[in-house]
Swiss-Prot record:
Topology in the lipid bilayer: Multi-pass membrane protein
Protein's name according to its UniProt entry: Uncharacterized protein B0495.9
UniProt subcellular location: Membrane
Keyword Transport assigned: no
Transmembrane segments: 101-121, 226-246
Residue segments, region Disordered: 58-90
Domain of life assignment: Eukaryota
GO CC terms, sorted: membrane
Keywords assigned: Membrane, Transmembrane, Transmembrane helix
Keyword Lipid metabolism belongs to the record: no
Length: 267
């Protein structure tokens, strides 16, 4: 009986010790969990505070940058307004005088060049038109065959002027020329010829060759064209090119003068 009582007491003590151990272990685990939750809560709060500080700092930087950009825009607007108020800079009178001299020089050069070109165009025509009258360009003429048989082969022709624009040739006769046994009533005779100048030259030389006259001994043949459309177009193109070159050079000269003036103003 006593031994059973001791066994029961020992067993109760063991059970009580086991439960106390379990309770202590559970209490320790609960304390650890509470500590971990506190740490996690503190970390979360720290992250939240850090994010808030970053957002606030970024907002402050954006605001400062915006204010800086607005200040620069205002400064540019003020500078632009100042430039508009100042207006275009006045050009030095000496620069204007130089430009006027240059314009006059270019105009004079263009006039002289045009005059030379016109002189060269009409020099040959003036020599060819020597001995001709205005009526020679309008009065009716004779056929080419009649001219060869009655005038050319009888040696009564001194010089021939071919006018391609009028489809005719003007033959200037010798003084005292005799035609059909009579003295010629006019100093020239008009020959109707609708073909070109090369063909006219070939026909005249062939007729002279038939009577034994060589190429070097034949009648002088001149070409009279006058102021044709082609010559007029060439003249206009030449004058336009000269004027364009003068304008471009004038712009370059004006730019150089203004740059030099600006450099002198800075110094």
């Amino acid at each position: 009986m006593r031994s059973q009582l001791l066994f029961s007491t020992h067993r109760l003590a063991r059970c009580f010790g086991h439960r106390c151990s379990i309770f202590a272990t559970t209490s320790h685990e609960n304390a650890l969990i509470s500590t971990q939750k506190s740490i996690i809560s503190m970390q979360t709060r720290a992250i939240h505070l850090t994010s808030f500080k970053f957002i606030r700092a970024r907002h402050t930087d954006d605001k400062q940058e915006k204010n800086q950009n607005e200040g620069e825009d205002n400064q540019k607007g003020e500078n632009k307004t100042t430039d508009q108020q100042d207006g275009p800079k006045k050009i030095d009178p000496s620069v204007i005088r130089k430009l006027r001299i240059y314009v006059l020089a270019v105009a004079g050069l263009s006039f002289v060049t045009s005059f030379i070109m016109l002189s060269q165009m009409f020099t040959g025509d003036r020599n060819s038109a020597d001995g001709l009258t205005n009526e020679d360009f309008t009065r009716p003429g004779i056929p080419m065959k009649t001219f060869i048989d009655k005038y050319l082969k009888h040696g009564e022709v001194q010089r021939i002027v071919f006018v391609p624009n009028n489809s005719r040739a003007i033959a200037i006769l010798h003084r005292g020329a005799v035609i059909d046994g009579k003295a010629a009533s006019e100093a020239s005779v008009i020959v109707e010829y609708p073909q070109n100048a090369q063909q006219f030259w070939a026909d005249v030389r062939r007729a002279e060759g038939e009577i034994g006259i060589g190429l070097t001994e034949g009648v002088q043949i001149d070409l009279y064209q006058g102021m044709t459309t082609v010559k007029m177009i060439q003249l206009i193109i030449g004058v336009v090119i000269l004027a364009w070159l003068g304008t471009q050079y004038g712009r370059l000269l004006r730019k150089r003068l203004l740059e030099n003036q600006a450099k002198k103003g800075k110094n």
